[in-house]
Amino acid sequence: MKHVLQSVLVTGIMFLYSFSFGQSQETVSPNIRIQKTAQESYVHFFVNAIGTNLYYGDANSGLADFKKPALGITIGASYQAGISRHFSVVPELYFIMKGGKLKENNPITDFESTLRMYSFELPVLARLHVGKFHFNAGPSIAYNVHGTQKIDDVTTDLSFKDVEGGYKRFEAGAQVGAGYTFMVKQKKVFLDIRYCHGLTNISNSAEMYNRSVLVSLHISKK
């Protein structure tokens, strides 16, 4: 599954780039080409809502009925670098709260539990613009700064040492999504919805991958 997703991601990015390059020039005569206007470049800072969960591998598929999303926030900055009329590159850096919850009587902890990770994440996205819509795809890396696990109202810190029961500092993932830009009272409103798929196991002793859905809303002057 991971290899399939990686192949789809790479193919998608190559398609976005090749499509945008082909659209970035316009022929007006056999020997003259005129470069079309590129997408605008800008920086914006954000505080966004995020819903996160954990995937425990195919061997623990029975946990699906016990999983609950953990709500969190992301705080950071995004830079859109306009390359052509239909294409831009978007690196971002933000602080993010990840993790997931399990209901009581689950096969792993038996009690209701919440696992939280506090991380810095750096995605680099290829963005295709089609009218007021845009589509994102790209890789991301993250560094897990701190983590906690709450079981039956008892909270403990996660260990990031290379030991049984420990967790990993670094992880890699892929992000895909889409958005829409519209005007409200002379203000430009930018809505972006994104799915974040962890590709690397964050646990030293079991299968555990981060999954999240990120909703971003940005308002700027026209």
Describe each model-derived feature in a short phrase.
Residues 160-165, 171-174, 179-222:
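Predominantly the C-terminal beta-signal and adjacent terminal strand-loop region
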Residues 45-49, 73-83, 93-95, 122-130, ...:
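Residues on the lipid-exposed face of transmembrane beta-strands in outer-membrane beta-barrel proteins
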Residues 1-39, 222:
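Cleavable N-terminal export/targeting peptides
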Residues 54-67, 97-118, 145-168, 203-205, ...:
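Flexible, solvent-exposed loop segments that connect beta-strands
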Residues 39-43, 69-73, 116-120, 168-174, ...:
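Residues that define the transmembrane beta-barrel architecture of outer-membrane proteins
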Residues 21-79:
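Short glycine/proline- and aromatic-enriched beta-strand/turn motifs that initiate or cap beta-hairpins
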Residues 37-45, 85-89, 131-135, 170, ...:
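Outer-envelope beta-barrel architecture signal
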Residues 27-34, 53, 80-85, 130-132, ...:
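Outer-membrane beta-barrel proteins
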